[in-house]
């Protein structure tokens, strides 16, 4: 990938993360409560996933947001 393509890819990822964050906040009844849940999950992940290196470029807070949105919007993921 050349430098221009990398910038475009990173830009798209940022927009996806922002969209997912807004989606999570809109779904939630209480923004404060969901923010605390995300922070606690990210803190747990930071210490639990020290040995697991899936993608070191994704910070625990971003991973927590993306996982929580998927869990809420796609409950069939959890039931499987």
UniProtKB/Swiss-Prot annotation:
GO terms for biological process: DNA-templated transcription. Keywords: Chloroplast, DNA-directed RNA polymerase, Nucleotidyltransferase, Plastid, Transcription, Transferase. It catalyses: RNA(n) + a ribonucleoside 5'-triphosphate = RNA(n+1) + diphosphate. It is found in: Plastid, Chloroplast. SUPFAM superfamilies: RPB6/omega subunit-like. InterPro entries: DNA-dir_RNA_pol_omega (IPR003716), RPB6/omega-like_sf (IPR036161). Belongs to the RNA polymerase subunit omega family. This is Putative DNA-directed RNA polymerase subunit omega. It comes from Gracilaria tenuistipitata var. liui. The gene is rpoZ.
